[in-house]
């Protein structure tokens, strides 16, 4: 006789991964509950990560755009906004996103339970509710989508009012004149752009030898130059020895012997999975040193009835990929296999000012692979649309095979890069002979548009062939 469970599946976490899994499961007729530890759904992406930081960035970039526009640059009407004002804008966006996502669950009759989940045995969860009570829930299968949080080294005092991580920075109540950012990954670079755009002095401490080393080197160099040109001080190959919080700021002692002082510190060097409270040892699961779980191609953990998606499994740690991982896991959970798979070339969007976005292979990788490729470039400053709106900083680069004309990689630096990249991605994903750079020469683009950069870059690249 089959065992009777409260639910077919329980999803732990309501971020993009949890939402993708829950929606995928209910659409297939499964009885699903979603456990969320906070009062509102959306996870870290909505409340502390993607949404608020991008809302901040947008507000700051619009202020920069206004102040740099020659129509308004008589210095009598320069825009100024406090960090608190800009955070209010982010809060409005968060509230809209929360209401929308709450509606998804309600319309699909997906039960949401608030509390902290922990495993009791292979099919049982204990739910510690906000009122102090404990509920017991059973399910045949589980999806762990509990996300991640900023990594906190034990020798840094995050209780100090001037030491922030990428979550607590959203609660900053003072106006810093000088910010230290430790960690020059995606989060560190994005906040360096935001603070510098608000005319705050920024010291960016990079533990590596160049910014965002996973990017095509030309894009990384473009960002480095843009930071240098805007006044961001970048210190490469540095690690902290000691961090001291004091009444008027923070002092950082570097292993190289340097000392830096600023009004506050943003520590943005890595993230860790939110798995420590799940009591995974009770079901025989182990995490790595950063609290992340290993999964197979169908997002199953070492326990076949337990799946994991999103930040808790590490790379690529993107909201967009997490949602797709959730949908794929839901299909595998119900049917035993998934026909859908995560695409091979996942686009990356980095919301610095200006943006960086890429899809496919870099020049460095193609050179190492000994692939005969060619490069086509378009500078934004040569596009009519960019000249009209004053977006002269930026470039689009297309890498393609010299013989087959197949597009191998696309890299973009400039405003709207994360939108522009998808035009090229759509052609790259075409099967058969559909993936060819000649498409951009043979199609007609609206004029004037930023999309026209593809035609300019394609012609530039094809003209290099002989």
Curated annotation (Swiss-Prot):
Its cofactor is FAD. InterPro entries: Class-I_Pyr_Nuc-Dis_Oxidored (IPR050151), FAD/NAD-bd_sf (IPR036188), FAD/NAD-binding_dom (IPR023753), FAD/NAD-linked_Rdtase_dimer_sf (IPR016156), Pyr_nuc-diS_OxRdtase (IPR001100), Pyr_nucl-diS_OxRdtase_dimer (IPR004099), STH_gammaproteobact (IPR022962). It is an enzyme of class 1 (oxidoreductase). It is found in: Cytoplasm. SUPFAM superfamilies: FAD/NAD(P)-binding domain, FAD/NAD-linked reductases, dimerisation (C-terminal) domain. It comes from the Bacteria. The keyword Ligase does not apply. It catalyses: NAD(+) + NADPH = NADH + NADP(+). FAD binds at residues 36-45. One of its GO terms (cellular component) is cytosol. One of its GO terms (biological process) is 2-oxoglutarate metabolic process. The keyword Isomerase does not apply. Its EC number is 1.6.1.1. Coiled coil: none annotated. Keywords: Cytoplasm, FAD, Flavoprotein, NAD, NADP, Oxidoreductase. Conversion of NADPH, generated by peripheral catabolic pathways, to NADH, which can enter the respiratory chain for energy generation. HAMAP family: SthA (MF_00247). Homooligomer; probable homooctamer. This is Soluble pyridine nucleotide transhydrogenase. It comes from Escherichia coli O157:H7.
């Amino acid at each position: 006789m089959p065992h009777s469970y409260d639910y077919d599946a329980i999803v732990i976490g309501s971020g993009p991964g949890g939402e993708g899994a829950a929606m995928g499961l209910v659409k297939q007729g499964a009885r699903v509950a979603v456990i969320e530890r906070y009062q509102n759904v959306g996870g870290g992406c909505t409340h502390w990560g993607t949404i608020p930081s991008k809302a901040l960035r947008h507000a700051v970039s619009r202020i920069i755009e206004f102040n740099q526009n020659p129509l308004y640059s008589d210095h009598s009407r320069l825009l100024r906004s406090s960090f608190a004002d800009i955070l209010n804008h982010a809060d409005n966006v968060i509230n809209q996103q929360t209401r929308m996502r709450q509606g998804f669950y309600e319309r699909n009759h997906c039960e949401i339970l608030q509390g902290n989940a922990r495993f009791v045995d292979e099919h049982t969860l204990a739910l510690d509710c906000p009122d102090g009570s404990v509920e017991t829930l059973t399910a045949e299968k589980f999806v762990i989508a509990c996300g991640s949080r900023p990594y906190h080294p034990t020798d840094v005092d995050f209780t100090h009012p001037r030491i922030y991580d990428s979550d607590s920075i959203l609660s900053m109540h003072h106006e810093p004149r000088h910010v230290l950012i430790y960690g020059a990954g995606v989060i560190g670079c994005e906040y360096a752009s935001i603070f510098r755009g608000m005319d705050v002095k920024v010291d960016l401490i990079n533990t590596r030898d160049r910014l965002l080393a996973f990017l095509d080197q030309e894009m990384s160099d473009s960002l480095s130059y843009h930071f240098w040109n805007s006044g961001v001080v970048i210190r490469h190959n540095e690690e902290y020895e000691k961090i001291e919080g004091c009444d008027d700021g923070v002092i950082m002692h570097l292993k190289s012997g340097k000392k830096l002082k600023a009004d506050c510190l943003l520590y943005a060097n890595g993230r860790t999975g939110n798995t420590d409270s799940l009591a995974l040892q009770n079901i025989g699961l182990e995490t790595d040193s950063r609290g992340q779980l290993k999964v197979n191609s169908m997002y199953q953990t070492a326990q076949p009835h337990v799946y994991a998606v999103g930040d808790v499994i590490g790379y690529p740690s993107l909201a967009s990929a997490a949602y797709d991982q959730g949908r794929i896991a839901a299909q595998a959970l119900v049917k035993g296999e998934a026909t859908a798979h995560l695409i091979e070339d996942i686009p990356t969007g980095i919301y610095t000012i200006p943006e960086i976005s890429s899809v496919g292979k870099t020049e460095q990788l193609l050179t190492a692979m000994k692939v005969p490729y060619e490069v086509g470039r378009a500078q934004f400053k040569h596009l009519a649309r960019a000249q009209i709106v004053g977006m002269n900083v930026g470039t689009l680069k297309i890498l393609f095979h010299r013989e087959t004309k197949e597009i191998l990689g696309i890299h973009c630096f400039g405003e709207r890069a994360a939108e522009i990249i998808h035009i090229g991605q759509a052609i790259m994903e075409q099967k058969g002979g559909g993936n060819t750079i000649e498409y951009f020469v043979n199609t007609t683009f609206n004029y004037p548009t930023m999309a026209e950069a593809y035609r300019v870059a394609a012609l530039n690249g094809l003209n290099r062939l002989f």
